[in-house]
């Protein structure tokens, strides 16, 4: 039996609804521990008209059999978008992360948080990915968007576009390549073909449209078994099953990914000591508790945990 953790995310968003909709996916030989509050689950269950069956426990140590469990932190907070809802989301993330690091869990699925309200609550990180790496004491990590159709890894994550050229360097790119080579065979059990994108239009056009390719990317990949630098506008024309694209910035990778796999992909943090997955969308405050949330990405994220978590 494996034990997986699922954080509720921002309770003002669609995280609680997604958890309810995953109930049938959790009716197997594994144990699933939800980090959240009972009153939130009951509210979601009432609004959506769906029964949700679980057992309350104080810690993962109390989980002895398959089923769905709830660890309540006994926190009160708003069910409307606010620093209060952001604070709850971070509390659930912190508790689940601690249990994953201590090997009490075989992996975690984190429901979406809102970066603005998380920051407003005192959270000092740009996102869950950065927090997870800090808590796990990992300096080398990366955000990977994973699907059957396309897989991308980001060299930089949540930084402004104007700062990207100064953020990339030879060491950074080598580090991301090593992460991919080490992590993918370990967790996902295949040897990837790594395709490195250029930063500039046409990958710099021989230095006519920027020199980051010549000064940074080419030196970084010269002795590596990778393909690149590839012009970003043609990189995704021909995608093979084992391809992993190393993209220089967030939207360079996320735009093609969400076009091809928005409802069938997952956000995976590579470099951690455990497997973490997350839906590839946000809190969707505008449709929360209306029964409108699509569970596809959350379901795929859970499936990855079950398939590859250990």
Curated annotation (Swiss-Prot):
InterPro entries: PdxA_fam
Keywords, ordered alphabetically: Cytoplasm, Metal-binding, NAD, NADP, Oxidoreductase, Pyridoxine biosynthesis
Main localisation: cytoplasm
Pathway assignment: Cofactor biosynthesis; pyridoxine 5'-phosphate biosynthesis; pyridoxine 5'-phosphate from D-erythrose 4-phosphate: step 4/5
Keyword NAD: yes
Molecular function GO labels: 4-hydroxythreonine-4-phosphate dehydrogenase activity; metal ion binding; NAD binding
Reaction catalyzed: 4-(phosphooxy)-L-threonine + NAD(+) = 3-amino-2-oxopropyl phosphate + CO2 + NADH
Subunit and interaction comment: Homodimer.
Protein name: 4-hydroxythreonine-4-phosphate dehydrogenase
Gene that this polypeptide is encoded by: pdxA
């Amino acid at each position: 039996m494996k034990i997986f953790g699922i954080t509720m995310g921002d309770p003002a968003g669609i995280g609680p609804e997604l958890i309810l909709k995953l109930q049938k996916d959790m009716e197997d030989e594994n144990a699933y521990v939800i980090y959240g509050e009972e009153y939130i689950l009951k509210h979601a269950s009432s609004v959506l008209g769906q029964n949700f069956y679980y057992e309350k426990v104080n810690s993962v140590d109390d989980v002895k059999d398959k089923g769905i469990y709830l660890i309540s932190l006994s926190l009160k907070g708003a069910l409307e978008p606010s620093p209060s809802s952001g604070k709850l989301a971070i509390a659930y993330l912190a508790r689940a992360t601690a249990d994953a690091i201590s090997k009490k869990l075989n992996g975690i699925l984190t429901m979406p948080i809102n970066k603005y309200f998380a920051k407003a609550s005192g959270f000092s990180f740009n996102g869950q990915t950065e927090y997870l790496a800090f808590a796990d004491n990992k300096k080398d990590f990366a955000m990977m968007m994973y699907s059957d159709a396309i897989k991308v890894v980001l060299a930089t994550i949540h930084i402004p576009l104007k700062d990207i050229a100064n953020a990339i360097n030879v060491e950074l790119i080598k580090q991301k390549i090593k992460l991919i080579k080490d992590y993918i065979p370990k967790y996902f059990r295949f040897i990837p073909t790594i395709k490195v994108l250029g930063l500039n239009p046409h990958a710099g056009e021989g230095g006519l449209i920027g020199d980051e390719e010549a000064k940074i990317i080419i030196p970084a990949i010269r002795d590596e078994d990778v393909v690149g630098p590839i012009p970003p506008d043609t990189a995704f024309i021909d995608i093979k099953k084992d391809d992993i694209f190393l993209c220089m910035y967030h939207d360079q990778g996320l735009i093609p990914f969400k076009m091809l796999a928005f409802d069938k992909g997952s956000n995976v943090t590579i470099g951690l000591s455990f497997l973490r997955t997350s839906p590839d969308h946000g809190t969707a405050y505008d449709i929360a508790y209306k029964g409108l949330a699509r569970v596809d990405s959350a379901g795929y994220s859970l499936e990855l945990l079950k398939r590859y978590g250990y």
